[in-house]
């Protein structure tokens, strides 16, 4: 599939031009984080083979690892059955969470 065909498969309109994106460790299967992508960040992710996201608080694109060095190298990208959520499997360098934890999901509730 080329980039335009990939973008046609994704329903960006449901989430105000943003889609939730689950980041999972390619090797262990551990869920590392959830972030949001728009078309531009998905295009940059595919072009660079590293994850790019849309920051809802800063309203700007950001490349995971650009500041910390904890890059995420894309191994595969999957779309869900409704076309409105992505699962990206990555090779994670260092911790995924800005707190220094491997995963953003380190706090158990139950």
Swiss-Prot record:
* Assembly mode: Homodimer.
EC class of the enzyme, as a word: hydrolase
Q: Does the keyword Signal apply?
A: no
User: Binding positions for Mg(2+)?
Assistant: 80, 82, 84
The protein's required cofactor(s) are namely: Mg(2+); Zn(2+)
* Cross-referenced InterPro entries: PRA-CH, PRib_AMP_CycHydrolase_dom, PRib_AMP_CycHydrolase_sf
Source species of the chain: Clostridium botulinum (strain Kyoto / Type A2)
Biological pathway: Amino-acid biosynthesis; L-histidine biosynthesis; L-histidine from 5-phospho-alpha-D-ribose 1-diphosphate: step 3/9
Keywords attached to this Swiss-Prot or TrEMBL record, sorted alphabetically, are: Amino-acid biosynthesis, Cytoplasm, Histidine biosynthesis, Hydrolase, Magnesium, Metal-binding, Zinc
Any GO BP annotation: L-histidine biosynthetic process
The similarity comment for this entry is: Belongs to the PRA-CH family.
Quote the EC number. Answer: 3.5.4.19
Q: Name one GO cellular component term.
A: cytoplasm
Name this polypeptide is given: Phosphoribosyl-AMP cyclohydrolase
For this protein, the record's Pfam families field holds: PRA-CH
């Amino acid at each position: 599939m080329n980039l335009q065909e990939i973008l046609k498969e994704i329903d960006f309109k449901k989430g105000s031009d943003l889609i939730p994106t689950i980041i999972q460790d390619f090797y262990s299967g551990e869920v590392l984080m959830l972030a949001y992508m728009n078309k531009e960040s998905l295009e940059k992710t595919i072009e660079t083979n590293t994850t790019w996201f849309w920051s809802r608080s800063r309203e700007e694109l950001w490349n995971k690892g650009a500041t910390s060095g904890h890059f995420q190298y894309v191994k595969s990208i999957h779309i869900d059955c409704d076309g409105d959520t992505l699962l990206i499997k990555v090779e994670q360098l260092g911790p995924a969470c800005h707190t220094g934890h491997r995963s953003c999901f380190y706090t158990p509730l139950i």
